[in-house]
């Protein structure tokens, strides 16, 4: 574009020209024919520039002059006031100042009126431009938008010559620009009025932009010509872009604000500098009479500035004018510094922008859950493996993970593999904004994972409790399932007003369940493995070889499920339904949800014949997958009575009561598949029998109302608090004490160790469904300083002793007769602050290997076996019932530590490889596939991870598991413990004694007794039916010798667990049968009833035959006196301990 165009057909009458142009030597410029311009084509750029300079410097001069006069006036006035005060002091205060000064009162009134008027106007202007009000925000945003509009007009006009003749009434862009600048002028006035410091306001960037852009527009209208000039300065308004976005509440985070700030400063500087180069290069140098100009578009200048800032400098575009080159020299210094600092920081902010920001978009017809807390590769993979297991049918639930740390590459890859059902968002549940992002208000549940390996369990629990508080505060109705490490921290959850276990909120206490599982293994070895496998989803692994792994893995494939019973079972007793379901449907039902006359739900585990199946009864089944359990719901006596193949039992065409009442069954029926849980009214509150089932008359008659033997709930044995000094045994005292059939608990802990929570280990062993003489003595071996810290929770339990020492000392172990114990428990030291994971269990592994390598003199066991105190519970040596017929004949004692029953707690699963030296387990083998775990001699807290998903799909499963392993702990009892941190004793009443009438887990020997005929090649299904019909015992598994399948005899005494064997499974004489046995009211008077015997009877191959005896009514009256005399001797001995 050229500034030299020939002018033709112009009006030469100077009087008709709109402007009287002074005569001066100037370059003739071309103009359009349509616009009446100066006939001589004189440049008028100086007029536009002068308008801005005069405005700027004139205003600056006025402000400085006003400040100077104000300063002089203030100084003079101040001097006059001083003289006046001096005169008042000298003249007594009656004289007046000179006549030039007004009276004081009148002057003060005028100043106050003046200040009040100015202040009100100033405040009004401040409100108008303030972003704190709606009007101010609208005005600020409008000014910014119009500034960008003016900049766009500049971009459009930059394609025209720098100076051209344009008619204001015909040029549309000039009219729009004029309107914009009128608005800018008004806004400038408001800003000027509201400014506290007028001088700084006059010098700030936005004011300078207005000075050099607004006045030239009015000059353009007057001269009928346009000059691009300094209109590019409007680009500096982009610096305020971040402020505008903050006013609109779009930018909220510091990183986003910083990013927008850097980008806006960089772009505005870039565009402004490009505008200056465009101006000088297209105009030329004034001292060269504008002859050295070059034609550059604005965007070519933008390109030139970019290659200059980046130090590339291709040379294809460069500055020719002196002004342009001089500007480039200084711009390179500043531009290069800005480019080198701003661009990397911008890239870093963009690169660090949260990849997992955004918000969750709910899918119609699909529920979602939020998982938070301890999110790592291990915890997430374990959770997903169980939650998305194929045996759960189609899980139509999306999993949303929320964590404040972005996932590493391995975890990110895991999320990508499950991208159809898993999403990850970076954030914190403590932030309500992040909770809104994951749509917590519409989530079906929120699951909180805990770090099981943290160094400070109390701190981890506190973090999870705060997460619960935050989530419940945001949405009180959300269902929360959280993991807790310490039992005593569960009490804090009860303080949250919206926490309601009846609505589905659950706290899975890992210490409570872990120690409960171990405690049950003291009563029925191997039970911890069986229960852990039942609530964990495992795929079936088929092995053709006839090895112990084949039978173990067949049982591992079983899980716990719930399903509603068909109306065909209504009216039948629980044992009758159990037998029918097992024999015909190939299912094992162990419990039901029972509604009392008050419509209160309770879960009954193996109730007796008195419980009849109601309509809509929920059954708890052990099966290999959810499809098999549906047979219990589809079963129809008319259609399926003659079917022998259970796979053919499917929904029939009969009109069923369930179909007539869909509102009763349908809402709950699908809880397995989609997580639909029971309604609040159906949440079971207790796992005990009907309250009407009170003890028999004999038990009530023998009840001593003045003695507190049980806690206030009647669920546990209780005794008055004992001082710890009274239960401490020295090594010599322990050696002199007759200890047999007891439980030795080895503890590695010191005064600084985190508390294990030994109460959770002792409570199941002190459940009230055991008679007092059946309770196993518990001996703790460990640091006295640590045990003192735990004693406050243990001092109300009977038959507890402490031997200060170390489990690594063989002398301490011999002192407690470890070779005669029923179980040796080795608990982890909780040393989770060790970097090497393999060393976390070093004490437990060393203690286990130390015990297994010990040798014992058989004569000691024989001598002690001849003493009365060695008599195992459930056997009377003076009774004729003590015969091989009942399987309680005492065998020679253990001579090697390898035969001592041990269960070892491990922190790190991989350390299980060090426990058994004769196994061939690979270090990468999963825990449940290893020999120590299959045999029930090792337990790790990691197996409890599966309870999170199991509880979500069915909260009754957690209630069932908790009752089985804790001995009967209920929410009411937890509230009581939270109040006092100790069990409270209570008097025996028919109501509390009724709570003793509940099932317990035991083991049944097949070597002799009523089932001896089935032990040698018999059928497991026949044993199941016989035990159920005769003794109301519900069998659910086998504890078999590891080498029982071999044709040649083996000296190995290790056993493994077989869960829910099929009906035709062949039995061997050495098998021990897991069973749920009823509470025997008469066992308190006669110890020849079916009771749990000392498990030292199976700890060696010679003693594997006797665990339980079968009730015998013969000679019962004759044995009562003998038992009473022996009980007196034992009570005296217990007091001494």
Swiss-Prot record:
Q: Which segments carry the region annotation Heme-binding motif?
A: 636-640
Annotated Ca(2+) binding sites: 913, 916, 919, 921
Where would I look for the motif Selectivity for potassium in this sequence? 311-314
Compositional bias segments (type: Low complexity): 1088-1112
> Which molecular function term from Gene Ontology is one that the record holds?
metal ion binding
> Motif Calcium bowl at which residues?
904-926
Topology within the bilayer: Multi-pass membrane protein
Q: What catalytic reaction does the record list?
A: K(+)(in) = K(+)(out)
Q: List the InterPro entries.
A: Ion_trans_dom (IPR005821), K_chnl_BK_asu (IPR003929), K_chnl_Slo-like (IPR047871), NAD(P)-bd_dom_sf (IPR036291), RCK_N (IPR003148), Slowpoke-like_C (IPR048735)
Q: Which family does it belong to?
A: Belongs to the potassium channel family. Calcium-activated (TC 1.A.1.3) subfamily. KCa1.1/KCNMA1 sub-subfamily.
What more does the record tell us? The protein was initially thought to contain two functionally distinct parts: The core channel (from the N-terminus to the S9 segment) that mediates the channel activity, and the cytoplasmic tail (from the S9 segment to the C-terminus) that mediates the calcium sensing. The situation is however more complex, since the core channel contains binding sites for Ca(2+) and Mg(2+).
Q: Self-association or partners: how does it assemble?
A: Homotetramer; which constitutes the calcium-activated potassium channel.
* Entry protein name: Calcium-activated potassium channel subunit alpha-1
UniProt organism field: Gallus gallus (Chicken)
Its ancestry begins with: Eukaryota, Metazoa, Chordata, Craniata, Vertebrata
Gene behind the chain: KCNMA1
């Amino acid at each position: 574009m050229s500034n030299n165009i020939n002018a033709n057909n112009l009006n030469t009458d100077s009087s008709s020209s709109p402007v009287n142009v002074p005569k001066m030597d100037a370059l003739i410029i071309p103009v359009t024919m349509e616009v009446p311009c100066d006939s001589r084509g004189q440049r008028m750029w100086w007029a536009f520039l002068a308008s801005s300079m005069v405005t700027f410097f004139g205003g600056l001069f006025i402000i400085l002059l006003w400040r100077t006069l104000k300063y002089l006036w203030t100084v003079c006035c101040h001097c006059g006031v001083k003289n006046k005060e001096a005169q008042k002091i000298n003249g007594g205060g009656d004289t007046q100042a000179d006549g030039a000064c007004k009276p004081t009162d009148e002057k003060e009134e005028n100043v106050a009126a003046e200040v009040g008027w100015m202040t009100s106007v100033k405040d009004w202007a401040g409100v108008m431009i303030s972003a704190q009000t709606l009007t101010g925000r609208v005005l600020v945003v409008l000014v910014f938008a119009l500034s960008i509009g003016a900049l766009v007009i500049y971009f459009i006009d930059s394609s025209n010559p720098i100076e051209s003749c344009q008619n204001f009434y015909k040029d549309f862009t000039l009219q729009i620009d004029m309107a914009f600048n009128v608005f800018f002028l008004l806004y400038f006035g408001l800003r000027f009025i509201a400014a506290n410091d007028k001088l700084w306001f006059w010098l700030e960037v936005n004011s300078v932009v207005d000075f050099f852009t607004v006045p030239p527009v009015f000059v353009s209208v007057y001269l009928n010509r346009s000059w691009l000039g300094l209109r590019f300065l409007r680009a500096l308004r982009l610096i305020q872009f971040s402020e505008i976005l903050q006013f609109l509440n779009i930018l909220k985070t510091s990183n986003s604000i910083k990013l927008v700030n850097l980008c806006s400063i960089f772009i505005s500087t870039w565009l402004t500098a490009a505008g200056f180069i465009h101006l000088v290069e297209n105009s030329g140098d004034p001292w060269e009479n504008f002859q050295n100009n070059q034609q550059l578009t604005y965007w070519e200048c933008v390109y030139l500035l970019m290659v200059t800032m980046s130090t590339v400098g291709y040379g294809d575009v460069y500055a020719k004018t002196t002004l342009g080159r001089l500007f480039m020299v200084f711009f390179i210094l500043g531009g290069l510094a800005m480019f080198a600092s701003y661009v990397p920081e911008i890239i870093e902010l963009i690169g660090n922008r949260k990849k997992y920001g955004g918000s969750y978009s709910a899918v119609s017809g699909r529920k979602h859950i939020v998982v938070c807390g301890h999110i790592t590769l291990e915890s997430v993979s374990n959770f997903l493996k169980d939650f998305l297991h194929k045996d759960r049918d189609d899980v139509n639930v999306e999993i949303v993970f929320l964590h404040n740390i972005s996932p590493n590459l391995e975890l990110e890859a895991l999320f990508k593999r499950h991208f159809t059902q898993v999403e990850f968002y970076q954030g914190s549940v403590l932030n309500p904004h992040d909770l809104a992002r994951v749509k917590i208000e519409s989530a079906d549940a929120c699951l909180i994972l805990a770090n099981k390996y943290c160094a400070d369990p109390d701190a981890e629990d506190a973090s999870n409790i705060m997460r619960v508080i935050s989530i419940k505060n945001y949405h009180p109705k959300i269902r929360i399932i959280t993991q807790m490490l310490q039992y005593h921290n569960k009490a804090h959850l009860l303080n949250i007003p919206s926490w309601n276990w009846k609505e589905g909120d659950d706290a899975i206490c890992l210490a409570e369940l872990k120690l409960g599982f171990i405690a049950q293994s003291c009563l029925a070895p191997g039970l911890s493995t069986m229960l852990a496998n039942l609530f964990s989803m495992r795929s079936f692994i088929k092995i053709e070889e006839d090895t112990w792994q084949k039978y173990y893995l067949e049982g591992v494939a079983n899980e716990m499920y719930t399903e509603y019973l068909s109306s065909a079972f209504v009216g039948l007793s629980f044992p009758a339904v159990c037998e029918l379901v097992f024999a015909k449907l190939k299912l094992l039902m162990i419990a039901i949800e029972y509604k009392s006359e008050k419509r209160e739900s309770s879960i009954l585990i193996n109730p007796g014949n008195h419980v009849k199946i109601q309509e809509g009864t929920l059954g708890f089944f052990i099966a290999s997958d959810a499809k098999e359990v549906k047979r219990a719901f589809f079963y129809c006596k008319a259609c399926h009575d003659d079917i022998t193949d259970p796979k053919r039992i499917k929904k029939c065409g009969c009109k069923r009561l369930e179909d007539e009442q869909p509102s009763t069954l349908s809402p709950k029926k699908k809880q397995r598949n989609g997580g639909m849980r029971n309604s609040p009214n159906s949440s079971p509150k207790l796992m005990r029998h009907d309250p009407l089932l009170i003890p028999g008359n004999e038990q009530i008659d023998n009840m001593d109302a003045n003695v507190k033997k049980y806690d206030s709930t009647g669920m546990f044995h209780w005794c008055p608090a004992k001082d710890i000094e009274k239960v401490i045994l020295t090594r010599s005292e322990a050696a002199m004490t007759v200890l047999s059939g007891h439980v030795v608990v080895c503890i590695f802990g010191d005064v600084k160790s985190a508390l294990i929570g030994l109460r959770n280990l002792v409570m199941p062993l002190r459940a009230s469904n055991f008679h007092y003489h059946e309770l196993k003595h518990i001996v703790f071996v460990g640091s006295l300083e640590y045990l003192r810290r735990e004693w406050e929770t243990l001092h109300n339990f009977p038959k507890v002793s402490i031997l200060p020492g170390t489990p690594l000392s063989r002398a301490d172990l011999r002192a407690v007769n470890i070779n005669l114990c029923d179980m040796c428990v080795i608990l982890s030291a909780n040393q989770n602050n060790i970097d090497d994971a393999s060393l976390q269990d070093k004490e437990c592994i060393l203690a286990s290997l130390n015990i297994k390598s010990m040798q014992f003199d058989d004569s000691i066991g024989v001598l002690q076996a001849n003493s009365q105190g060695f008599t195992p519970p459930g056997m009377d040596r003076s009774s004729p019932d003590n015969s091989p017929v009942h399987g309680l004949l005492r065998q020679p004692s253990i001579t090697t530590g390898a035969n001592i029953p041990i269960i070892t707690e491990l922190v790190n699963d991989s350390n299980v490889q060090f426990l058994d030296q004769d196994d061939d387990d690979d270090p990468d083998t999963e825990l449940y596939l290893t020999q120590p775990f299959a045999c029930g001699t090792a337990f790790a807290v990691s197996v409890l991870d599966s309870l999170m998903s199991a509880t979500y799909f069915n909260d009754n499963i957690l209630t069932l598991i908790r009752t089985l392993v804790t001995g009967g702990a209920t929410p009411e009892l937890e509230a009581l413990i939270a109040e006092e941190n100790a069990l409270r004793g209570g008097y025996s009443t028919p109501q509390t004694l009724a709570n003793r009438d509940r099932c317990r887990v035991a083991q049944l020997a097949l070597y002799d007794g009523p089932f001896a005929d089935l032990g040698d090649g018999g059928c497991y299904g026949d044993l199941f039916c016989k035990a159920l019909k005769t003794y109301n015992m519900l069998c659910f598994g086998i504890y078999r010798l590891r080498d029982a399948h071999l044709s040649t005899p083996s000296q190995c005494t290790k056993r493994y667990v077989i869960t829910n064997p099929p009906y035709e499974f062949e039995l061997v004489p050495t098998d021990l049968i897991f069973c749920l046995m009823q509470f025997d009211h008469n066992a308190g008077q006669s110890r020849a009833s079916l009771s749990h015997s000392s498990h030292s009877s199976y700890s060696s191959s010679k003693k594997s035959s006797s665990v339980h005896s079968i009730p015998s009514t013969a000679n019962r009256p004759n044995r009562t006196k003998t038992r009473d005399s022996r009980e007196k001797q034992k009570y005296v001995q217990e007091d001494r301990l």
